[in-house]
Amino acid sequence: MDTTPAAPDASFDLDPAEIRVLGVLVEKAFLTPDAYPLSVNALVAGCNQLTAREPVMALSEGEVQAAIDSLLARRLVSRRDQAGGRVAKYEHQLRLRHSLPPAEQAVLALLMLRGPQTPGELRSRSERMHRFDDIAAVEAVLEHLGEKYPPMAAALPRAPGTKEIRHMHLLGGAEALEAAAEGLASAAAGGTGRGRLAELEEEVQRLRSEVAELRAAFDTFRQQFD
């Protein structure tokens, strides 16, 4: 396994297949440690699960292998060659690359595999990976992920008709965050009153400003390695 130190990612811009593969590796390290690290076939099965996945995907072996190769190049995944083993197996490197303890790995895996969620949803769904004493503990993890450089999670504007704020991962880059905000604006246009729509438009504008700040921070960080 290559252990040569690498510069931290200046920004995240993983595609959906890469996010799914990375999320599966983190999840299975918790849930099936005896079968970890994972082969390509095991990763295909995990990526295309019909449960605990949003959205459900149908990735081919070639697509999964391409995602693995990209993650290997980013040092987010490594290959582990086992004595006497003929099949290549892979493990994630989030703990080493981004100093993520188990609680943060569990929350990030859920966000990668199931999309934006509330702290309450994250607490209940993380039970098999990491037990949180209360919602405040989840919120503390989300806050810490958001304070990383570059940030790994962010809060979304409150969706129409809901009381709780959802959080999403930022491994897809600032564009993914902006797309999520645009989706909320579209949902608002479908069935909310003018007052609520104006409120949501203000929230989207605020989020766009945060995206611009994130991009500026990414550019500044990237210049350190040019």
Curated annotation (Swiss-Prot):
Top-rank taxon: Bacteria
SUPFAM superfamilies: Winged helix' DNA-binding domain
One Pfam family in the UniProt entry: DUF480
Gene3D superfamilies: Winged helix-like DNA-binding domain superfamily/Winged helix DNA-binding domain (1.10.10.10)
Family membership: Belongs to the UPF0502 family.
Protein name, as recorded: UPF0502 protein azo0627
